[in-house]
Amino acid sequence: MSERTELIRKLGSSKFNYWFGYAANISLVIWLCSHGIAGGKSRLTPGQWIGWSAVGFFSWTLSEFLLHRYVYHLWESFLSEGHALHHRTPRALIGVPWYLTAIALWAVFEALCLVTRPQITGVVMGFNWLGYILYCIAHHGSHHWSLRWNWFKRMQRHHLIHHAHPECNWGFTTPIWDYLFGTDFDRRRAPATAKPTQ
């Protein structure tokens, strides 16, 4: 194991980092969404809250696909090394160090606030990050839980296929992007196994 990979393993695989990351991320969601409130009053209308939170939550699904495909698999970085470590030891508690996540999220927020209103940016990013937290819970569950819910079983199967075939199934909680971009394992395999028509 290279020195860099060993450092990544040490930074990202402590139980404290893994579990505290959830608390830190929930705090980030609250901090981001608090920009939609000032002096105890909402800075957005109820319709804006609903609309912008939906945009944020939906944007997570595409963010998840793009991060997983490019940052974790195609581009070489400490994040891709950490993700490769996860592929080798899928049940290990490995996560991006919580403080790096917080710094990155703060920097993106500040940059976006240069071109948008902070209350909108905060709500969109807050609900985007809520999607990330739900993804983390579902991802953990796919490797550690055995639930009988059909949705969970489909999601788990989709993800475990990705571990066996890392070139596909990059969308995890929402495989719709794999369908749209042609990276779904079942759809890629279907033409090869389909019987010719008469």
Where are these regions (language model features)?
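Non-catalytic, topology-defining segments of multipass membrane proteins
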Residues: 1-132, 167-198
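Functionally important transmembrane alpha-helices
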Residues: 134, 151-160
